[in-house]
């Protein structure tokens, strides 16, 4: 096998810390495996002294298989382990020595931490936990453990976390369960391993003597705690060889961070950093476009993927009306592709898999899915829909009503519910409520209205029920209040329910359809089809001749919670995730966005827009804080040269007015010549970058009522908007809000121009 000079340098590295920054398709696994062989054959290192830490068990099995195909004489002598398997070995041996007994409650389908916590919570509080609630808890719990954060402090500092009271209650209960029953989970394997090697010098010395050379694959996905464990074991020889790509760090929810790689030199001052920047996988234009995408991030090593072939390929962008048409277009394109080529259909959210599975089922297309963790029919929103529909079928069912009454925007008091315990068995709940003494007019009207709403709901077709529940019964208002910081836009779930409800009359038929889809997805995990559907996270490390990235919708990718968090690091991770998706493609790349979700207009993802406008003079800009970009470009055909546009907004012209003392102007709609300027006596910086004033970022903030935004210098977010809807307003009103990040102060300015 012929290696590049970069690969040879990495393979020949012997002792001391080394970081190999490898772009997608650069042959990093090949390099890691050949370095093992080089250590054994050229440096006489015993096989038992080398350990390779892999990201997943399946990855380790595959790497061992590849190594033994070329070197069968080393069967049973080479060690590939996940970090959890490595730590389990440490913890198990230490506990055996010290006669400590603990039971691992992960990796066992019959006896796992989710079931244990669900049962314990119900036994203690007589309430059932939803899948969303328990998944939210373990996401936060796992993250804090791997980042070595205090759980309670993290909850206090992060106000974006919904239902913090419940999260804290679950934290206390879960730790209590583990303590009382001598349980441990995967997090505890890491925590205990770190504790044992920190306090037991004999144990640490034994590990140092046994493993002299550490290799870590997918180093960008290693958490802070995992890095710390390895750092202690390799010290002071520091024979650690890490293969990574900071641009593919997509597991922050597991405690991973690109900063672990960016700080490598400070942790290991005498380390060597190797760059493997030749991409042998993708065509020239796929590499070029993906390079431009990832350069939008700031927290990264500066590097570029280099192509190794001049072969051109297709990058096609589709903007279609809705998910149904998106599915049809995917089928159409698949039929045009050589049946011997591989196809990967990638998505940000697991819920998208059901759109694809449904259309493939209807077209008799076989497909493979690695895993599908989204259990749709146990989803909180679907359960609510189910209960609301069940109650419409029998409005005397008090048990069902108790599960939904506080979600109907009716302000029903708990006292009212208590009094309903004495109602007649067959009496309508609303009739019983109307019989209560001393109801004011509000409640009389509300209960009468709800009684009539549920009568109408019962008579509707399944497809029509969804909008009625959302907009008429009041469930949409409940979700708006509850879902402010949720990862998933609930319109995506409602859209899917309606999508799957086509030609279905009853809710029972709908549930039956979900069961069929569930069985199809289960069988697909054993399929040998060359068509795969996968989350982007699960596709990492894989490659396909053709890649479809679907559902590129603002608020879904990047996720709503990321855009609402104003956290630049989270937005950068979403960009890395998109970069990972793009770089799975070898020959062709198809990107899809839609115009409507749940019959409501939606905007394309900022990443889709960046690709769509990649040939403009100036690229899409976006400021820290997670705001989407607004295209800024030079309009050569008018006397007003600087223009920007975003979404359905018309082109706005920006120009330099040389005559007035207020030189910077832009024209919007029928209001030409609005003046923007730098007043040295205020804290407002320059508003637009043009001519001699570089570095100001202009962008469109779609997620707030202040749509036109730009940032400059230390003022991270400057908000500008035209309040056209202000009641009784005759003046053109612009508002500026500057946020000084050095002291977190905010200043607001209101300017009025009276235009004829």
Residue ranges, per PLM feature:
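Conserved motor-region signature of P-loop NTPase helicases/translocases
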Residues: 1-62, 224-241, 246-395, 531, ...
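Accessory/regulatory regions of helicases
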Residues: 360, 553-619, 626, 636, ...
């Amino acid at each position: 096998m012929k290696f590049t000079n970069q690969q040879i340098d990495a393979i020949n590295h012997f002792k001391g810390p080394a970081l190999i920054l490898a772009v997608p398709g650069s042959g990093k696994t090949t390099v890691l495996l050949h370095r093992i062989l080089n250590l054994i054959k050229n440096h006489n290192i015993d096989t038992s002294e080398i350990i390779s830490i892999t990201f997943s068990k399946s990855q380790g099995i595959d790497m061992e298989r590849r190594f033994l195909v070329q070197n069968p004489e080393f069967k049973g002598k080479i060690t590939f382990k996940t970090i959890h398997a490595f730590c389990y070995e440490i913890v198990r041996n230490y506990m055996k020595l010290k006669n400590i007994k603990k039971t691992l409650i992960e990796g066992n389908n019959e006896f796992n931490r989710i079931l244990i916590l669900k049962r314990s919570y119900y036994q203690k509080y007589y309430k059932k936990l939803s899948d969303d609630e328990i998944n939210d808890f373990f996401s936060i719990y796992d993250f804090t453990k791997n980042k070595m954060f205090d759980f309670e402090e993290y909850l206090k500092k992060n106000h974006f976390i919904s239902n913090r009271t419940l999260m804290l209650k679950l934290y206390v209960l879960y730790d209590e369960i583990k303590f009382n029953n001598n349980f441990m989970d995967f997090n505890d394997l890491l925590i205990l391993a770190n504790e044992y090697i920190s306090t037991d010098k004999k144990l640490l010395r034994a590990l140092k003597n046994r493993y002299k050379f550490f290799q870590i694959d997918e180093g960008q996905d290693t958490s802070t705690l995992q890095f710390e464990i390895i750092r202690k074991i390799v010290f002071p020889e520091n024979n650690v060889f890490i293969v990574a790509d900071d641009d593919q760090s997509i597991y922050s929810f597991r405690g991973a961070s690109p900063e672990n790689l960016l700080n490598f030199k400070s942790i290991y001052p005498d380390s060597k950093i190797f760059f493997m920047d030749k991409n042998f996988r993708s065509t020239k234009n796929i590499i070029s476009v993906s390079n431009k995408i990832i350069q939008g991030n700031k927290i990264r090593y500066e590097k570029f993927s280099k192509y190794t072939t001049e072969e051109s390929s297709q990058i096609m962008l589709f903007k279609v009306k809705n998910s149904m048409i998106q599915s049809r277009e995917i089928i159409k394109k698949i039929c045009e592709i050589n049946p011997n080529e591989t196809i990967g259909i990638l998505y940000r959210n697991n819920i998208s898999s059901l759109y694809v599975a449904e259309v493939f089922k209807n077209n008799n297309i076989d497909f493979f899915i690695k895993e599908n963790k989204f259990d749709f029919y146990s989803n909180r929103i679907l359960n609510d829909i189910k209960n609301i529909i069940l109650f419409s079928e029998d409005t005397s069912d008090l048990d069902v009503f108790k599960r939904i009454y506080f979600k109907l925007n009716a302000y029903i008091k708990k006292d009212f519910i208590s009094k309903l315990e004495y109602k007649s068995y067959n009496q309508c709940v609303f009739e019983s409520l109307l019989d209560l003494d001393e109801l004011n007019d509000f409640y009389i009207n509300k209960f009468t209205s709800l009684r009539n709403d549920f009568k109408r709901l019962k008579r509707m077709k399944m497809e029509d029920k969804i909008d009625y529940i959302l907009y008429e019964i009041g469930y949409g208002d409940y979700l708006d209040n509850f879902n402010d910081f949720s990862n998933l836009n609930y319109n995506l779930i409602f859209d899917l329910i309606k999508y799957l409800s086509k030609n279905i009359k009853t809710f029972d038929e709908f549930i039956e359809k979900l069961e069929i889809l569930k069985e199809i997805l289960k069988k697909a995990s054993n399929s040998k089809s060359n068509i795969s559907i996968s989350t982007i996270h699960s596709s990492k490390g894989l490659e396909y001749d053709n890649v479809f990235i679907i559902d590129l919708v603002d608020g879904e990718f990047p996720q709503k919670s990321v855009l609402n968090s104003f956290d630049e690091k989270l937005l950068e991770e979403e960009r890395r995730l998109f970069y990972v998706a793009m770089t799975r493609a070898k020959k062709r790349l198809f990107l899809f966005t839609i115009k409507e979700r749940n019959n409501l207009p939606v905007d394309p993802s900022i990443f889709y827009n960046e690709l769509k406008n990649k040939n403009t003079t100036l690229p899409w800009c976006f400021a820290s804080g997670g705001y989407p970009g607004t295209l800024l470009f030079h309009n050569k055909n008018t006397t007003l040269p600087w223009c920007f546009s975003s979404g359905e907004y018309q082109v706005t012209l920006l120009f330099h007015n040389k005559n007035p003392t207020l030189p910077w102007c832009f024209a919007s709609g029928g209001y030409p010549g609005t003046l923007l300027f730098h007043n040295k006596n205020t804290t407002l910086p320059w508003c637009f970058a043009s001519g001699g004033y570089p570095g100001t970022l202009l962008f469109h903030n779609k997620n707030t009522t202040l749509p036109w935004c730009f940032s400059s210098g230390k003022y991270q977010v400057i908000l500008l908007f035209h309040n056209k809807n202000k009641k009784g307003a005759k003046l053109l009103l612009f508002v500026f809000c500057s946020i000084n990040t050095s002291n977190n102060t905010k200043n607001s300015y209101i300017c009025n121009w009276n235009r004829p």
